[in-house]
A protein has these predicted regions:
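N-terminal secretory signal peptides that target proteins for export/translocation
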Residues: 1-8
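Active-/binding-site microenvironments in catalytic and ligand-binding cores
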Residues: 29-354
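Bacterial N-terminal signal peptides
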Residues: 13-25
Length: 354
């Protein structure tokens, strides 16, 4: 990370400070309730979060953010160093096999416009300096590249219910989700903690299918001299994204290492004992694959976090620069695409500020 920020970085930093100040002054609480009812007190040690925010809630544990928690997170950013946690997506990028391929196609181009002349405003006698434009049409899955899973992403049971009891028979649709879609994920500003498990093990990346245990979490915290607090965004580094390169087209290598991840026991530790508000990693699925023998589902961590606890999952977060600089605590900021019906925020560019 550059020690001296460019003018653009400084301007961006000042903008973020201004936004955070506005956030605090507005006393905006995501649950729509007062500070007391939406405070971290709603989390219960030993139980975690769960369906505690009311029968119409679509936000989950992110309700715990308050102006006070945002202000506290902003105070971590004392150096002004901005870390880009997003990865570049292209039509060749690696993705989980359960998601559709994508295409990025030129829709309009200066040469095409000149030949087609299908708009009056580009006729030569009107468009005398030959102004042209580029635009693209995208066919893309809503779970690719850097992501934050929405609470409607995963369903459970014969009734196909998701977080807070919303059911497919009531709230599914031909044009995406009608409850808990990605538009319900609020802007996230929180204390972030990176747990460098690859660093703990002294390897570039964890072995394929490595299961990150509660013991690993405690060992990393001790090694990094880091503490977890209720309301944290917790991100695990496996080292997988060191192989992403320019656009994630090194599919065979990524597919191999993308299988390392956390166990259900680790997820429960973070939620029920530490109060994690969002849990993520540098892989496509956060949890170890395949699921441990005896698991009732192929993705037990997703089921527990999204459906049972209402805790969003961050995926494909680029953590290599944070690991290089040994930055384990930071202010985490992320916003998602406000596309109605989508099941996740995708191709995101969250940032960590220290």
């Amino acid at each position: 990370m550059l020690k001296k920020l460019t003018r653009m970085h400084r301007a961006y930093w000042l903008l973020l400070v201004a936004v955070a100040a506005l956030f605090t002054q507005s006393a905006y609480v995501f649950s729509g309730k007062d500070d007391e009812s939406s405070s971290i007190k709603r989390w219960k040690k030993g139980a975690g979060w769960g369906w505690i925010w009311g029968e119409e809630d679509e936000v989950g544990s992110l309700n715990a953010m308050t102006p006070e928690s945002v202000s506290s997170a902003m105070k971590i950013a004392t150096r002004g160093n901005v870390y880009d946690l997003g990865i570049t997506y292209s039509r060749r990028s690696f993705k989980w096999p359960g998601h559709s391929p994508g295409e990025i196609m030129s829709y309009r181009s200066p040469e095409g416009e000149k030949r087609q002349l299908d708009h009056d405003f580009i006729a030569p006698d009107v468009n005398k300096i030959a102004t042209g434009w580029h635009s693209c049409a995208l066919f893309i899955n809503d779970n690719v590249a850097t992501q934050i899973d929405g609470l409607g992403h995963i369903t459970a049971g014969d009734d196909h219910h998701w977080y807070n009891g919303f059911r497919e028979g009531d709230w599914g649709g031909d044009f995406g989700l009608r409850k808990c879609d990605a538009t319900t994920i609020p802007p996230i500003v929180a204390r972030g903690v990176m747990l460098d498990v690859a660093g703990l093990k002294g390897v570039d990346q964890l072995d394929a299918h490595y299961a990150i245990t509660p013991e690993d979490v405690e060992a990393v915290l001790k090694r990094q001299k880091t503490k977890l607090m209720p309301g944290d965004v917790v991100l695990f580094r496996t080292g997988t994204l060191r192989h992403w390169g320019d656009d994630g087209s090194n599919v065979d290598v990524l597919k191999k290492y993308d299988t390392a991840g956390i166990t259900l026991e680790t997820a429960k530790l973070l939620v029920e004992q530490y109060g994690a508000m969002l849990i993520g990693s540098d892989t496509s699925g956060l949890e170890v694959a395949p699921a441990p023998e005896g698991s009732p589902t192929f993705i037990p961590v997703h089921n527990y976090l999204l459906v049972e606890q209402g805790v969003h999952i961050g995926e494909f977060h680029y953590l290599e620069d944070l690991a290089r600089d040994k930055v384990y605590e930071f202010c985490y900021m992320a916003t998602v695409n406000k596309i109605a019906g989508t099941t996740a925020g995708f191709t995101l560019r969250p940032i960590a500020i220290r």
